[in-house]
Swiss-Prot record:
Transmembrane segments: none
Cited NCBIfam families: dGTP_triPase, PRK01286.1-1, PRK01286.1-3
Entry keyword set: Hydrolase
PROSITE patterns linked to this entry: HD (PS51831)
Record InterPro entries: dGTPase, dGTPase-like, dNTPase_2, HD/PDEase_dom, HD_domain, PHydrolase_assoc_dom
Protein name from the UniProt record: Deoxyguanosinetriphosphate triphosphohydrolase-like protein
């Protein structure tokens, strides 16, 4: 086949989807690939990055080493990308862009999940704070250093916009009223990411895929850990209906397989709901371009009102019964202590950091030093953070 005849399915997209042929491009000019679309190249660069590999040993609720089968940021990101591609295909969007955003959406997370982020944000309180979405942008535009002609991954405008705004506008009447991290504002002077507008539909697919996958894997991990039981899910509206159907169709099924079946059906039910509701939203709004999507006064890829209530109930149940389980809270507090003590140690004596990091600390202001330490700390895996803690504080690992 002649290279020019490769079919990128450009004609299969809806008129309101992102189109790699009309991409806003990259910050640093690069010639177009003859064998991959710009969004495919973004996806591939993300997969080959150091940040992507480190997701293997970063966790969300359960700490690395507690079990080989608990989700990590890596497995979660792959699951999110699978759901995002399904949604994008159903809505005639660019699957590669949805996948790229999904695969990179957790790049900025610290070791030890949200406990680590809370601790680092507290440590950075006087230096601009810490936000995982802003950190993801720092990683893909600066901290990844793999290419000869630029720092970062030099991703397309559309992928960067999706990373920054997949949860909605950061400025304007539809923003969440939180302060916009300085790193995002500074980068926005180089490439206008339209912070007051909604992201494209591919980013919206990635965002809601994250919610679906998050609920599913927390059910699975909660059952696996025995912190949760199937009986408890009979008290939650959505899972109660699903469990009743499973019992009716497979009365002899053992509880382990019933748990797997519950997770599978929960994902399918939510995905089908999002597709149906999003199609209805599109039919109502009638966008004729990406600009119409970005200027819409609402998120378009959503749950139905009924499913939104069910999803909120499920999330509240998981927060109460899993995230605030005594053993999870104990590990969370230990994780926060580790991150806080590591930050304080590096700040007081930067020379204890690896040479590749402490060599950059000369002549830095206090704020610049704190940000460099945040870059170092947030990039750590759970394993590496534990090893650093043991090295610096000469203690045995009693964490897990």
């Amino acid at each position: 086949m002649h290279i020019s005849k490769i079919n990128f399915n450009y004609q299969a997209r809806a008129i309101y989807s992102a189109n790699p042929q009309t991409s806003r491009g990259r910050l640093f000019y690069e010639t177009m690939s003859t064998i991959r679309s710009p969004f495919q190249r973004d996806r591939d660069r993300i997969i080959h990055s150091n940040a992507f590999r480190r997701l293997k040993h970063k966790t969300q609720v359960f700490i690395a080493d507690e079990s080989d089968h608990y989700r990590t940021r890596l497995t979660h990101s792959i699951e999110v990308s699978q759901i995002a591609r399904t949604l994008a295909r159903a809505l005639c969007l660019d699957e590669d862009l949805a996948e790229a955003i999904a695969l990179a959406h957790d790049f900025g997370h610290t070791p030890f999940g949200h406990a680590g982020e809370d601790a680092l944000n507290e440590a950075m309180a006087h230096y601009g704070g810490f936000d995982h979405n802003a950190q993801a942008l720092r990683i893909v535009t600066k901290l990844e250093q793999r290419y000869a002609n630029f720092d970062g991954l030099n991703l397309t405008w559309e992928t960067l916009e999706g990373l920054v705004k997949h949860n909605g506008p950061l400025l304007g009447p539809y923003a969440n009223n939180k302060d916009v991290p300085i790193d995002i504002l500074q980068y926005n002077t180089k490439q206008d990411l339209k912070l007051n507008c909604f992201a494209g539909l591919e980013a919206q697919c990635a965002a809601i895929a994250d919610d679906i996958a998050y609920n599913a894997h927390d059910i699975d991990d909660g059952l696996r850990s025995q912190f949760l039981t199937l009986g408890q899910f009979e008290q939650v509206s959505l899972t109660a209906v699903l469990l009743k159907d499973i019992e009716k169709e497979h009365p002899q099924l053992d509880k382990t397989r019933r748990g797997y079946e519950l997770v599978r059906r929960q994902i399918t039910t939510m995905v089908e709901d999002v597709i149906k509701q999003s199609q209805e939203n599109l039919a109502h709004i009638k966008p004729t371009s990406i600009s119409d999507v970005q200027q819409a006064e609402q998120t378009i890829v959503t749950f139905s009102p009924t499913m939104a209530v069910y999803e909120k109930e499920l999330k509240n149940f998981l927060f109460k019964n899993l995230y605030y389980h005594d053993q999870v809270l104990s590990r969370r507090n230990a994780a926060k202590c580790i991150v806080q003590k590591l930050f304080d140690c590096y700040y007081k004596n930067p020379n204890v950091m690896p040479e590749s990091w402490h060599s950059k600390t000369a002549h830095l202001t206090n704020q610049e030093l704190a940000r460099l330490i945040a870059d170092f700390l947030s990039g750590m895996t759970d394993h590496y953070a534990l090893r650093e803690y043991q090295r610096l504080f000469d203690c045995t690992n009693n964490f897990v």
